[in-house]
Amino acid sequence: MIIVTGGAGMIGSNIVKALNEAGINDILVVDNLKNGKKFKNLVDLDITDYMDRDDFLTQIMAGDDFGPIEAIFHEGACSATTEWDGKYMMLNNYEYSKELLHYCLDREIPFLYASSAATYGETETFVEEREYEGALNVYGYSKQQFDNYVRRLWKDAEEHGEQLSQITGFRYFNVYGPREDHKGSMASVAFHLNNQINAGENPKLFEGSGHFKRDFVYVGDVCKVNLWFLENGVSGIFNCGTGRAESFEEVAKAVVKHHNKGEIQTIPFPDHLKGAYQEFTQADLTKLRAAGCDVEFKTVAEGVAEYLTIQNS
């Protein structure tokens, strides 16, 4: 069996879909369906069972046996970069992850987890090294702290001549694609611009969006990376992005091209994002490629075209 936490979320449900397409359906999905809209991400997927996140964590902490587990994809987290309740964030993203990690280490279960490019903050060098990290929000800090916790475990194991089972962290950059309808304000810019045009409006971008550049990565490619590392058993913390920085304006142009209508408009930059907003991200893929992962990443034009064809069908 494979366990996918956050399996009703955007990335988690797409991983389940990718596993199904690979002929795997012995899957336990763990999530919190308090936001009931997320059920839509699961209705077309084949899984063995579903478990609430709190019940799952209780059983993990009790050391319960789930039977043979091939791997755990840990995608479950509070991913709202605008959430400033640090106690809540650290409990959900840090403590929960540590419990699950040690459960896997004790049983030699491969543990593949979601980190984030939010760990980098304002740097212009996006290399998986501590010196380039400095989160701008508590979400990024929670991910940064867990990455550092994993690094300490590796260092301790090395000093004692021990070999840990697989631990693989993925620093997701700006992920977009199908199954993000439930995310509200945290959904991708492509999602919001598409909705605006469908509502008969012009697509709206924040002032300065022609200069804001992010590494926008299509969720289907993210899943390919996850499955490659599952198959090859490589440990480490790796950037998961395209290696390209493209502007929000390029995303808007791709959405307009799909619809063949719409004129890009600008709106004031919101005060609550000032000082906590990454204006530039671009994954350095050196470490990913050195590991042997040869997944090719779609450009914004390619990814948005595929996404909106699915979204608007």
UniProtKB/Swiss-Prot annotation:
EC number: 5.1.3.20
Associated pathway: Nucleotide-sugar biosynthesis; ADP-L-glycero-beta-D-manno-heptose biosynthesis; ADP-L-glycero-beta-D-manno-heptose from D-glycero-beta-D-manno-heptose 7-phosphate: step 4/4; Bacterial outer membrane biogenesis; LPS core biosynthesis
Entry's Gene Ontology BP terms: ADP-L-glycero-beta-D-manno-heptose biosynthetic process; lipopolysaccharide core region biosynthetic process
Keyword Repressor among record annotations: no
Cofactor: NADP(+)
Residue positions binding substrate: 174, 185, 192, 206-209, 214, 277
Alphabetical keyword list: Carbohydrate metabolism, Isomerase, NADP
PANTHER family per record: ADP-L-GLYCERO-D-MANNO-HEPTOSE-6-EPIMERASE, NUCLEOSIDE-DIPHOSPHATE-SUGAR EPIMERASE
Protein name (Swiss-Prot/TrEMBL): ADP-L-glycero-D-manno-heptose-6-epimerase
This protein's encoding gene: hldD
